[in-house]
């Protein structure tokens, strides 16, 4: 019986829900241990079956939401959300209530309050300043803890109870949890795209060529140990090519799988908007697909 896809209750930047069926066709079967190295909003973790899940992300504020979910029953979480929404008068038109609630969260940093804030923020998006204060504006007529988000929370809850979370820089993750035949998925910031976390000005480590090379070195070492990996990335974006990525794939003989996805809704104003973006999944193992080939 096919497993039902579940959407995370967080609309995390770069989430893979819309393409999860595409990338999962290239995942190994019968996964024992899975590591999601840049777990973000958890869409990949909660939709991938494994005997044991590890989920890591440097953004501890978001990870703490899921950790807080693990501490409480589902009824307790939903009751807290409903009571808090009523107490503050949160709605999709009450900007004053939103701003007051945001100020309160930035003082207390209670994870469930952050979850509620995200529900009422512009496009349900997540953003912090360099002091780790939530600074997304109000989502007028667009923000609400609605039926869909409630359903996503309910469906996600049962899939995270046994996940082991961590908030380390990816270089410091304990890869000893992985043995030959285990699986790692990596969806890092994309070096040549518009991700807001590439600039390193929001309180978390930025992403540049050094981080890119560090990740490839780690994946190479894991591959040499017999660990399977899948890496999401873009090889081409608005006239730029990620030569570091392509050279590494070519040198190692890894496999490229094309993914159909549109990044035109990037938050940044970009030139050359008519130039293509090529979303790819790289694996260190072959998969049967017409869209699969090796540069080696």
Q: What residue spans do the PLM features occupy?
A:
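Class I SAM-dependent methyltransferase Rossmann-like catalytic core
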Residues: 1-29
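Mobile active-site "lid"/loop adjacent to the S-adenosyl-L-methionine
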Residues: 130, 134-141, 190-212
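Short loop/turn elements that flank and shape the SAM/SAH-binding pocket of Class I
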Residues: 171-175
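Class I S-adenosyl-L-methionine
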Residues: 250-296
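Class I S-adenosyl-L-methionine-dependent methyltransferase module
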Residues: 49-161, 286
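A structural motif corresponding to the C-terminal end of an alpha-helix
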Residues: 149-164, 216-230
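Conserved Class I SAM-dependent methyltransferase catalytic core
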Residues: 213-262
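Conserved proline-anchored active-site loop of SAM-dependent methyltransferases
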Residues: 23-26, 34-48, 52-60, 115-122, ...
